[in-house]
A protein has these predicted regions:
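Conserved SAM-binding loop of SAM-dependent methyltransferases across substrates and taxa
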Residues: 126-138
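C-terminal catalytic and target-recognition region of SAM-dependent MTase-like enzymes
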Residues: 228-287
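A short glycine-rich, Lys/Arg-flanked "PGG" loop and its adjoining helix->strand segment in the class I
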Residues: 211-227
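Non-catalytic substrate-recognition/targeting regions of SAM-dependent transferases
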Residues: 6-22, 29-96, 103
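Conserved alpha-helix/loop element of class I SAM-dependent methyltransferases that forms part
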Residues: 96-114
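Conserved class I S-adenosyl-L-methionine
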Residues: 115-125
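S-adenosyl-L-methionine
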Residues: 146-192
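Conserved SAM-binding motif I beta-strand of class I
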Residues: 139-144
Length: 287
């Protein structure tokens, strides 16, 4: 398992009864987590010192309850700064476990010694990976179907000192954007994708990951340059086991470029227990 253990401003303090107790900077949040199937004693005093609690609804969704929590605040990861704003579907605007991937590809970019690395970040959300890529010295194209998410990602770039970095911001359906890039003959040295389990594009395009992910990996592999550095696929869908990611990336990327594919779970350390909370999986190819 790849563990995002480099955080200072974030931690999973404890988890029990379908919820995880987290510290985001100086604020304590309690959010539902479908992986937390256990019921363990809640001994940490922070269980009773919440600044925000997302309550699930029996009808689906839910709502936030706030206790002296600002509408927006920031946390840092290494030399990156992220703007947090709790919003619908329990989210804060950041997936801290992805830091395990940021560290991995940042090292690859820096060690390549290349000054002209071009990276494509698809389903790019609020730009955690985009900022990490840019900070590592590469040019990045950030694509997300949500205008609001792209605006938020720009704010994160500015906060991280990347206002003048070579970042191209695109609001578009990711599949259609990739198809157009293929027609234009554009190439990238690395591709990152973080597809949702289910989603809709700006014109109502429906995305179901089990149906779409393999053809999409196939499509994206056509955008790789002659000397690609890495290819990363993230998954939060329990049906997409690491071995499934390895198989798909191997048939489409490794078959063409050689290199190595490794897939595994991604997790966050739990401070009170010393155990690890699983947070999905990732498949990684590198030359």
């Amino acid at each position: 398992m790849w563990i995002a253990d480099g955080w200072k401003d974030y931690e999973v303090i404890d988890c029990s009864d379908g919820e995880k107790l987290e510290r985001w900077g100086k604020y304590i949040l309690l959010r539902p987590d479908p992986q937390v199937l256990w019921s363990t004693p809640k001994k940490n005093p922070n269980w009773n010192k919440l600044n925000g609690h997302y309550h699930r609804s029996n009808k689906g969704g839910g709502e936030w309850e706030f206790f002296n929590l600002p509408k927006q605040w920031t946390i840092n990861y290494r030399d990156l700064t992220f703007n947090l704003k709790p919003f619908s579907f329990k989210h804060t605007g950041l997936f801290p476990e992805q830091a395990a991937n940021w560290d991995w590809f940042s090292k690859i970019i820096k060690e390549s010694g290349r000054k002209d690395v071009k990276v494509l970040n698809l389903f790019a959300y609020t730009g955690g990976a985009t900022c990490a890529v840019a900070k590592a010295g590469a040019a990045v194209t950030h694509v997300d179907a949500s205008k609001g998410m792209v605006t938020w990602a720009k704010e994160n770039a500015v906060s991280s000192g990347l206002a003048d970095a070579p970042i191209r911001w695109i609001v578009d359906d990711c599949v259609k954007f990739v198809e157009r890039e293929i027609r234009r003959g554009n190439k990238y040295d690395a591709i990152i994708m973080d597809p949702p389990s289910y989603g809709r594009g700006p014109k109502g395009e429906i995305w179901k990951i089990e149906e779409k992910i393999h053809p999409f990996i196939q499509l994206c592999s056509k955008l790789l340059s002659d000397t690609p550095l890495f290819f990363l696929v993230n998954s939060y869908t329990t049906g997409l086991a690491p071995a499934v990611l390895t198989y798909m990336i191997s048939t489409e990327v490794k078959a063409r470029y050689g290199g190595h594919v490794v897939s595994d779970e991604i997790g966050l350390p739990v401070s009170d227990t010393g155990l690890v909370l699983p947070c999905g999986a990732a498949g990684r190819w590198q030359e």
